[in-house]
């Protein structure tokens, strides 16, 4: 229901997934007093986005207003839910309290300062970020298995396995920005020397912008 609401109001069904992905680790760090936090890659640099942080291997969780408020798209999740309950028939009667929405909201600043948790670092500044090699590592060491079929909108079987919204998310981004999942994958693999530019172009023509099931 939240994903449908976010699609209708923001054009982004993936919104709640991103909120949880970004904020949940910080909540856990506060709970267990973990001061050193690593995310995987800075997607803004590895794929496409704002290059403002290209020389900074971390995000400042206290001072960076884009991190604090930007992901919320100007609307705290509780306000969005209140709007949905009042205006959307499919959300009528939904029971949702603050604790239900905790991990969709940024952590408390004062608690972060008190515990000395103020930054999250990106692994791609310390190790070469190679998505294909990351997959091989996980397959060898954690038993990760690829999908039997490729991910929608691209050719790989080991990326975009998070949930069933991925294909739809990348399709929406493709029709809005002309940037799909396949162009991200091919660009990285061309830079990593795994495929040629011509091979990448052929893959993009075949898979980028694929309508999801």
Where are these regions (language model features)?
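Nucleotide-activated chemistry modules centered on ATP-dependent adenylation/adenylyltransferase
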Residues: 1-213
